Amino acid sequence: MKKFSLISDYDVYLFKEGTHTRLYDKLGSHVIELNGKRYTFFAVWAPHADYVSLIGDFNEWDKGSTPMVKREDGSGIWEVLLEGDLTGSKYKYFIKNGNYEVDKSDPFAFFCEQPPGNASVVWKLNYRWNDSEYMKKRKRVNSHDSPISIYEVHVGSWRRVPEEGNRFLSYRELAEYLPYYVKEMGFTHVEFLPVMEHPFYGSWGYQITGYFAPTSRYGTPQDFMYLIDKLHQEGIGVILDWVPSHFPTDAHGLAYFDGTHLYEYEDWRKRWHPDWNSFVFDYGKPEVRSFLLSSAHFWLDKYHADGLRVDAVASMLYLDYSRKEWVPNIYGGKENLEAIEFLRKFNESVYRNFPDVQTIAEESTAWPMVSRPTYVGGLGFGMKWNMGWMNDTLFYFSKDPIYRKYHHEVLTFSIWYAFSENFVLPLSHDEVVHGKGSLIGKMPGDYWQKFANLRALFGYMWAHPGKKLLFMGGEFGQFKEWDHETSLDWHLLEYPSHRGIQRLVKDLNEVYRREKALHETDFSPEGFEWVDFHDWEKSVISFLRKDKSGKEIILVVCNFTPVPRYDYRVGVPKGGYWREIMNTDAKEYWGSGMGNLGGKEADKIPWHGRKFSLSLTLPPLSVIYLKHEG
């Protein structure tokens, strides 16, 4: 137990300044070599503790046998060096502060005991990656003018093994199926609901205790690296959900860590999160900022993640979020100035160190400039979920078509703010739980109409400006609400109706990726032009999508009633042939097969303020795309 430390004075300086982004190399447990011998170094931050000792299966969990030594530099860090390579050993920290005694998991552990156990495990993160080709080109994959279509996945319930007690697939088993399915379906990215270690499976990963450890339910850190590696080898980007907004109050976790409110706010009005029964990080504390910044950088560095989707940003920004009693900021306002500053520093640091990735905010209010650079006063995120579009669109589609004409403005409103942020259009897990029903369950009408409505929704979504996100199961019209305890209902693909939806999503992804007009200008008003949004009586809208050059043009016409429209005239800017490249009513998608025989020649009849027009057949409950071919 010789005098040795991985932690330099400069590390302590950065830690206390709130700017350390690689604490995972310093704190926690690390196997090292000194003079040809192996040792395991442990370090934990517990500034208010009177006594800290290391307990584990190597000392029979004896609280007195391995005391740690507190550094004398005021950092509050305790350290100990043990002989031998302790990889695979379970351990915790015994912390004493006056009469308060507790066994804590390591906040920086790379691996944890399988729940319900909660000990930390000494682990090395060595892994030989095979994704160098992908990493070289990923700047293109993740860029704003590239197609980004995200498949949102919960690892524990995408697929299960019913023959073996309905067990989960492991990370490695998932790696044999998921990358190929996602590639076949044409999605560009997978977004995992949080994989960071969480004690309660029913939290879907959103109540994290291990900010540096993938959950051991599905395998080891190397197994999770293998899954990401395989996705990358198939050209699929990986976005990880990350939760810096709150953490659970489990006794072994971060809460009341050293007998004081160390990681969380001191004042209960800022500390307590009533929605989730959890604690809020103290963003004003530099060491907590260093902890969170290090966690974010860790997943991008060690796990090659392509992006972080930051959960519940609104709850961080507002001091009165879901609270009756709250503390105003120094100016008397409700904005959490410390959280705002942290989010800006987080985005600046991530983009400085990993310029090829994206940060994505789930932010449910109209907070301005979430996805604008910090130097113009924004929060600095790369993209933001468009919750307004999601709410309005699902509200509209849930209405019986006979009443849709009275809600026409709900549908058209989204374009008024569509370019105020870099938006992702999310049909996420949140829309198919808690009694909300599945996507197809929200659709009105009989069996055929439900499928036609869902096909029309997808056709409209893929044509609307913004990147795409769809939660697993939606792509084949799962009828049941999502249940994290069971697999998706893959057997539904025996039915042509569900196969049709799946084929449509695959083809929409293919068209979206192929056509620059549908993805290059997702964030630019120059790429969108209304043709007609006034036909509320028939519930028909039409618009153009264009590429950056303005030369490639696609006309999108949506008919949101089950009434076919014949000889429906739509104005277009150019003469010549317009080829039908997508029709959600096609027979292959279990539609009625109505359409425009592959395309239409423009008539020299002025319409909708344009010199030319097309006389179209609009199938019932459908969306059609026509590309100008000259």
From Swiss-Prot:
CDD domains: AmyAc_Glg_BE (cd11322), E_set_GBE_prok_N (cd02855). One of its GO terms (molecular function) is hydrolase activity, hydrolyzing O-glycosyl compounds. Monomer. The active site is at residues 311, 362. One of its GO terms (cellular component) is cytoplasm. Belongs to the glycosyl hydrolase 13 family. GlgB subfamily. Catalyzes the formation of the alpha-1,6-glucosidic linkages in glycogen by scission of a 1,4-alpha-linked oligosaccharide from growing alpha-1,4-glucan chains and the subsequent attachment of the oligosaccharide to the alpha-1,6 position. InterPro entries: A-amylase/branching_C, Branching_enzy, GlgB, GlgB_N_E_set_prok, Glyco_hydro_13_cat_dom, Glyco_hydro_13_N, Glyco_hydro_b, Glycoside_hydrolase_SF. Its EC number is 2.4.1.18. SMART domains: Aamy. It catalyses: Transfers a segment of a (1->4)-alpha-D-glucan chain to a primary hydroxy group in a similar glucan chain. This is 1,4-alpha-glucan branching enzyme GlgB. Pathway: Glycan biosynthesis; glycogen biosynthesis. It comes from Aquifex aeolicus (strain VF5). Keywords: Carbohydrate metabolism, Glycogen biosynthesis, Glycogen metabolism, Glycosyltransferase, Transferase. It is an enzyme of class 2 (transferase). One of its GO terms (biological process) is glycogen biosynthetic process.
